[in-house]
Amino acid sequence: MGKLFGTDGVRGVFNEELTVELAYQLGRFGSHVLSEGSHNPKIVIGKDTRISGDPLEKALTEGIVSVGGDVILAGVIPTPAVAVIARELGADAGIVISASHNPYQFNGIKFFSGDGYKLSDDVENHIESFILEKKEVESHPTGTVTVLEHPEKIYLGHITKDFDCDFSGLKMVLDCAHGASYSIAPEFFVNGGAEVVTIGNKPDGKNINAGCGSTCLNVLCDAVVKEQADIGIAFDGDADRCLVVDEKGEIVDGDKLLHLIGVKMKKEGRLKKDTVVVTVMSNIGLDIALEKADCKTIKTAVGDRYVLEEMLNNGYNLGGEQSGHVILLDHNTTGDGMLTALVFLTLLKEDGRLASELSALMTSYPQVLVNAKVSNDKKKAYLSDEVIQLKISEVEKHFDGQGRVLIRPSGTEPLVRVMIEG
C-alpha cells in the first residue's frame, strides 16, 4: 500500500482526506497510466448514493477528459456492475466512487482494470507517484462524456446467464443499506417471481449504511421474523458483499455461505482443486465443515484483494470473507453481493430445506471481535509491544490449542481489530 491507496482504493472523509482536487488528479493521472499515454482512454464511472458522490464524479470526469479520456457515466450502481460494464464495453478502466460499508461522511475512489480486476499495487503506486511527485502529462484534446442508458441490463445480463432466476414461492426481505442496490435489487428479485419486502431503499445521501445493511443486521433479523419470510438478504452500501438471515431471524454469515456454496460446487465437480480461499479471520468451523466434505481451505491476509490474488495466482474459483465478500470467479471478477444472493437462493430452492437447516450444517466456534481506535501511524505498534505479546501468549496457552488470538490493523479505517476465537 502507498500513501494514498489503501487495501481498497483511496478512501477517507470527504473534503478532508478525500477532496475534489485529489479526485481530479486521480482521474487525470489514472487515465494516463491505464492507457499508457498511447491512446484516448475510455473509462466507466459508477457510484453509490452518498451526498459526496456527485462532486467527486464531476471532478473525476474533469480529470479524465483533461487528458483526452472518454467518460461513460453509469450512475448509481453496485460496485461489481462497474467491473462487468467496463469489461463488456471494452473500456480501459472502471472507477467506483464509494466507501462501501463506511458511514456517509466517508467516500472512496477505486479503480478496476479493463478486464474487471482491481489494480495491482504496482499500478496504484505508479498513479500515486504522479500525484505525490507532482509530475505532468502531455496535453490532449478534451474527451467526451456519455451517460449510459440502462447500465443495469448489461450487469444483470452477465451475472444471470448461467441461472434460471426463478424465485417463485420464496418470500424474502431485502435490506439495501440505502445504497447502490436500492433500486436494482428489489426489481430483479420481484421480476424473478419472489414476494419481496424491501427495507433500506430510500437513500437521502446521508443514510447509507446507517443502522441497516450487512454491517447492522438487527432490523433485517426482526423484519424476517415479523414478515414470516423464508429468507433475508442484506447488502452493504456498494453491494459488493451479501449476508443472509434465515427464517428464524438468525444470521448466516460469509463463512457459512462459503461452506454451502463450496460443498455444492464440489458435488457438481466445479470447485477447482477442491479448495476454498478464505482469510485468517474465517471461523475454524469452516475448516472443519469443508474438511468433512473433502474440501480444503487456503488462508490469506484479510481483504478481498488478497483472496482474489491467491485465487488468480493458483487457479482457484471460490473465495471470500466472513463479512460477506464472496468471489465466484466463474461468474465475475470481484466480490458481488447480488451474484452471491442469486447463487444462494438457487441453492436454497434446489435443496428444498429451510435456510436454518442449511446453516446448521456448519458449526461456528465462538468469536469475540473488538475494534480499537488507533491512529494510522500506531496501528502496528502491537507487534513490538512486549506487554501485548505476553498477554497474547497467556491467552493462547489457556486455550491449549483449541483457540487463538488475532490482531490486525484495518486497511481502510484508523482501527485495530482484536479477535479471540475458541
Where are these regions (language model features)?
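An N-terminal, well-structured beta->alpha segment
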Residues: 1-62, 66-68, 145-170, 379-380, ...
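Buried hydrophobic positions in well-ordered alpha/beta secondary-structure cores of metabolic enzymes
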Residues: 8, 45, 82, 95, ...
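Gly/Ser/Thr-enriched, mixed-charge loops and adjacent short helices
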Residues: 13, 107-227
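N-terminal small/polar loop signature for handling phosphorylated ligands or for N-terminal nucleophile
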Residues: 32, 36-107, 187-245
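Short glycine-rich phosphate-binding loop at a beta-alpha junction
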Residues: 39-48, 72, 171-173, 275-280, ...
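Active-site nucleophile and cofactor-binding loops and adjacent substrate-binding regions
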Residues: 71-80, 251-254, 278-279, 300-301
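Phosphate-binding and adjacent anionic-ligand microenvironments
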Residues: 231, 268-422
